[in-house]
A protein has these predicted regions:
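Bacterial Sec-dependent N-terminal signal peptides
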Residues: 1-45
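Glycan-recognition and catalytic cores of secretory/periplasmic carbohydrate-active enzymes
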Residues: 41-421
Length: 421
């Protein structure tokens, strides 16, 4: 325990020092970048225009989700109806997070009040142990609420959720097991310890739990998971496998495959985006440059791939067989844009800001942003859940809206020369 605590303390001191340096170095970089912008009015207007549309769309969706005194969780809209999910669904925290982002973008306390209601129906999730996505579910809801309003009790929920997620850590392979091997749509696959690249997105919860509690356990689990994933999930070109299955006895790899991509050896688009975002986040909390370098290499794969469209809204899989006659995935584009704005603040590489801006422009166009009053109230159209499972194909998805609003917030801060965190 003493050794682990010292390891954490040293890393955490480094993190705090890095954070201070970033605050000033990044501010200088961002101010220089903001001064160099040649079309500030256009950039400001695209943010304001999206906020105006989002107020109408997300307001309509929130109204629909609060009828009859019952708070429901909207996930998508298809066949003329809103689909709602239970609190234990992996996407259950995104709409609450979207409402928090609406508060952040507008300053209107009515959004904060709504966000609290939609957040607190997720209270039981802090004890959920049968899948890994509690990081998404709780940090995007309670985490944003704590950050923006410092709501009493929210910090405790985050720490308890990390305790629950830590029960899924498998010490022999050194990973957080994503799915139970015998439960859900993957239960027939014969896996022992499946880990999906999406799991990188749950690590922020663990880093924050250590920050809040002082317990190094969560930090160390997150680092071990990130390191093993870096070693096992990526090919030589920095594309990634969706699923790696580990042997719980030996810790070795039993197999590499896909669940939501086109083929075991293909590059499922959203998986690449999760990797870029996840490793950039790991860099933010650890200061370990390996993570940022890795995120940049995965980003390079995406941007250089021959099948990346000019508008930077990827096809659902970079190796899908019928490109260009394949569905695009707007959710992937939104995740990439948000991650790229953060990467820009650490690297000063204008490429990331330029590409993020291009994505925001694309998603703000009529090709991808819904007309006011349509799309069931969702902001963006044309996302893909899982084509192999026939699930949520070419529909709006709540996490596409979430990451798009996050990208707008980050864009605004970058262009104002402000720190993102």
């Amino acid at each position: 325990m003493r050794k682990a605590s010292l390891v954490y303390q040293n890393n955490y001191v480094n993190y705090l020092l890095m954070k201070i340096l970033f605050k000033y170095a990044t501010a200088a970089l961002l101010l220089a970048g903001a001064a160099a912008c040649s079309q500030p009015s256009k950039r400001a207007s695209i943010i304001d225009e999206n906020i105006a549309v989002a107020e109408k769309q997300i307001g309509m969706l929130a109204d629909s989700s609060e009828t009859g005194g019952v708070i429901r969780i909207p996930s998508t809209w298809k066949n003329g109806r809103i689909d709602y999910v239970p609190v234990d669904d992996w996407v259950s925290g995104f709409f609450a997070g979207t409402l928090w982002y609406m508060y952040e973008l507008t300053g209107d306390e009515a959004w904060a009040a709504r966000a609290r209601k939609h957040t607190e129906i997720l209270d039981s999730v802090q004890y959920l142990q049968w899948h890994h996505d509690v990081g998404f579910m709780i940090y995007d809801s309670y985490g944003n609420g704590l950050r923006l309003k410092n709501v009493p009790g929210y910090e405790d929920v985050i720490v308890q959720t990390a305790k629950s997620l830590a029960t899924r850590f498998r010490p022999v392979p050194g990973v957080i097991q994503s799915w139970d091997a015998d439960r859900g749509w993957q239960g027939e696959r014969g896996w022992q310890c499946p880990v999906i690249i999406d799991n990188m997105m749950n690590l922020e919860l663990m880093f924050k739990a250590t920050e809040f509690s002082g317990d190094s356990t969560y930090y160390n689990i997150a680092v071990k998971h990130a390191d093993r994933t870096m070693k096992e999930h990526f090919r030589d070109d920095y594309s990634c496998y969706h699923v790696v299955d580990y042997d719980l006895t030996t810790g070795g790899v039993r197999g590499r495959c896909t669940a939501q991509g086109y083929a075991d050896d293909s590059a499922w688009a959203r998986g690449q985006a999760w990797a870029v975002y996840g490793y950039t986040t790991c860099y933010r909390y650890t200061g370990d440059k390996r993570y940022l370098d890795h995120a940049r290499k995965v980003a390079g794969f995406m941007l250089d791939d021959k099948n990346m469209p000019a508008d930077l809204v990827p096809y659902w899989d970079y190796d899908a067989p019928n490109i260009p006659n394949e569905p695009r995935d707007v959710s992937t584009a939104a995740i990439i844009a948000s991650a790229f704005y953060e990467m820009y603040t650490y690297t000063g590489d204008e490429l990331y800001k330029q590409k993020a801006d291009r994505i925001v422009e694309s998603l703000s166009s009529p090709a991808y942003r819904a007309p006011v009053g349509g799309n069931g109230g969702f902001l963006l159209m044309h996302s893909v859940g899982s084509i192999p499972h026939g699930s949520n194909i070419d529909v709006p998805l709540n996490y596409a809206d979430y990451y798009f609003l996050e990208a707008l917030i980050r864009k605004a801060r970058v262009e104002a020369g402000e720190s993102l965190f």
